Amino acid sequence: MPNSLAGGQVPNPTLDAFDLVDRSLRNAGISGSIPGLEEGGTDPWTFSPLKNADQLKEVGMASRLRRVVSSFLKACGLLGSLYFFICSLDILSSAFQLLGSKMAGDIFKDNVVLSNPVAGLVIGVLVTVLVQSSSTSSSIVVSMVASKLLTVQVSVPIIMGVNVGTSITSTLVSMAQSGDRDEFQRAFSGSAVHGIFNWLTVLVLLPLESATAALERLSELALGAASLQPGQQAPDILKALTRPFTHLIIQLDSSVITSGITSNTTNSSLIKHWCGFRGETPQGSSEGCGLFSSCTERNSSASPEEDRLLCHHLFAGSKLTDLAVGFILLAGSLLVLCVCLVLIVKLLNSVLKGRIAQAVKTVINADFPFPFGWLSGYLAILVGAGLTFLLQSSSVFTAAIVPLMGVGVIDLERAYPLFLGSNIGTTTTALLAALASPADMLIFAVQVALIHFFFNLAGILLWYLVPVLRLPIPLAKRFGNLTAQYRWVAIVYLLLTFLLLPLAAFGLSLAGGTVLAAVGGPLVGLVLLIILVNVLQQHRPSWLPRCLQSWAWLPLWLHSLEPWDRLVTACCPCRACSNSPMTSKVAHCYENPQVIASQQL
C-alpha cells in the first residue's frame, strides 16, 4: 500500500526511486546496459549506501562487553587468517618450485630459443608461472648472464615475461570469491587490471626494445652514472614473520635451480635436508645472504654424514621425491589458501559495516581537494611501492588487495595505482638485493634490476600519466562484467593468458621468425581490427559500412557467449558456472520504470 499525506497528497518520489528508474532505463538499453545490472539490478561498481550503525546501539554493560569481546575476537581471527593466508602463498610458491624448477632449468638451457625475443618473453612468463616467484626467475636470468650463457640484450624480453607472470597469483586468489557474483566481479576485475597493464606494456615495449634496445642502453647509462658499492640486503620484514612457521613445513635450497643451469647438474634435490655441521651455527638463517647467493650447505657435501645436522622441517630426511612433495604441498597450500580467503571475506563483511566501513572506504578512496585531486593516484603509487618494499613481495601485496576489492573496501580506480606502485616496489627491492650479491654478479644483477625498474616506469608513463590512456581500467571492467554474467570466462582468461597463448607463441617462434610473422601477424591484425570495429560500433557507427554496424549477420556463436554458456552449463551444471534462477527472476523486476516509481510512492 502506498503511503499518503494529509489532504490526499502523494509524496514526491525518493532518490531511491529515481535511482531504480535510472537503472531500469539502462537495463532496457536506453543508455547502455551493464551485465551486472541486467542480472542483479544493482551496480557492483557503485557501492550501495551502508546501513546506519545506529541500529547497533546496545543497552546495558553486559551487551557492550559482549560486543567488545566479539570485536576483539573478530580482529584476532582476521589477523590470524591473514597470517596463514600469507604463509600459504609462501608454501604455494615452494610447491610450484618443486614441481617446475627442473622444467624451468631445462627451458632456460636452450640458448638458441632464447635468442628469439618472443620466445624469451614466453619463457619468462611460463617459468614465473611454474615457480611462482619473480625473484627466483630473476636470479636465474642473472646467473645465466653472469656465466656468459646469456647476453643482457637477450635477457630483456625474459624480464618482461617475468613481470607478466607475477600477475597470475592475484588472478588465482580472485577465483576464491566466485561464490558471490558481485564480489567476484570486483575481485576479478582487480586482478585483471594488473595483468592487462603488464600485457599492454609488453605489446608496446617489446617491439621498441627489439628495434632500439632502449631499456638496455638506459640501464647502461644508469650504471655508468652510478658508483656501485656492495650494500646490505633489503629489509625482510614479512619473511621474518612467516619464516618460523613456513620453515617448519618445508625448506628449499633455491641455488640448486641456478647451479643446475650453469653447471649442468640435475640430480640435486631442491629440498634442503642438512642445515649445518655439529659444533657450528646452523645456516638456516638468511642473514648476510644476497638474493643471488647461496647461504646454505649443499646436500652433496663431502663431509661425513654423522657430522651434519638434519634440518627441522616436515620433509627433512624424507625419501619422497621433489615431485611428490610438491604435489602434497600444492594440495595443502591451496586448501589453506581457500579457507583463509573465505574467512577473511566473511570477517571483513562482519567487521566493516555501518559507519566503520563508510570511514574506511572514504579514507582509502578519497581524493585531494580541487585542484590537487590528480595527486591522489600518484600518492597511491607511492603507498603501493612502499608497502611492497616493506613486505618484500608483490604477490602478497596484490593478493591482499584483491579480497578487499571484492568486499567493496577499495574501488578499481584506487586499486589500479596501488598495483602500479607494487610493480615499482618489487623492482626497488630487487635492486637493493642485487647490491648485496657477490662481486662477480654485481654489475649483471644491478643491470637486470634496472631494466625491470625502467620497464615498469615506462608502463606508468604510458598507461597512467595521461588519464585518457588509462585503458586497463575500462578493459578490466569489461572483463569483470563478463565474469559476472559468465563465470567460466575467468577460467578461460586464466588458461589463455598464462598458458595457451604463450605456448602457441612459443611454438610458432620455434619454427622461426618467418613462420611467426606469417601466422602471428595476420592473427594479431585481425584481433586489432575486430577491437576497432567494436569500438566504432559503440561510439561512431555511422563511420562504418552498413554490414559492419552490427555483427548480427554472423552466426550467433561467433558474436555471443550465450551458446557457449549453454554448452558450459550443460557440461558443468554447478552454481559457480551458471547463474542462479533467483538472479534471473529478480532482473525482470526492473523492466518497467513506471511500476518501480509507483511502488516507491
From Swiss-Prot:
Q: In which tissues is it expressed?
A: Expressed only in the kidney.
Q: Subcellular localization, per the record?
A: Apical cell membrane
Identify the residue ranges that face the Extracellular compartment according to the record.
97-110, 209-324, 391-441, 509-512
Q: Which molecular function terms from Gene Ontology are attached?
A: sodium:phosphate symporter activity
Note the topology in the membrane.
Multi-pass membrane protein
Q: Which residues lie on this side of the membrane: Cytoplasmic?
A: 1-75, 132-187, 346-369, 463-487, 534-601
Bridged cysteine pairs (disulfide): C275-C311
Q: Where are the transmembrane segments?
A: 76-96, 111-131, 188-208, 325-345, 370-390, 442-462, 488-508, 513-533
Q: Which GO terms describe its biological process?
A: intracellular phosphate ion homeostasis; phosphate ion transport; sodium-dependent phosphate transport
Q: Could you tell me which PANTHER family the record lists for this protein? A: SODIUM-DEPENDENT PHOSPHATE TRANSPORT PROTEIN 2C, SOLUTE CARRIER FAMILY 34 SODIUM PHOSPHATE , MEMBER 2-RELATED
What this protein is called in its record is: Sodium-dependent phosphate transport protein 2C
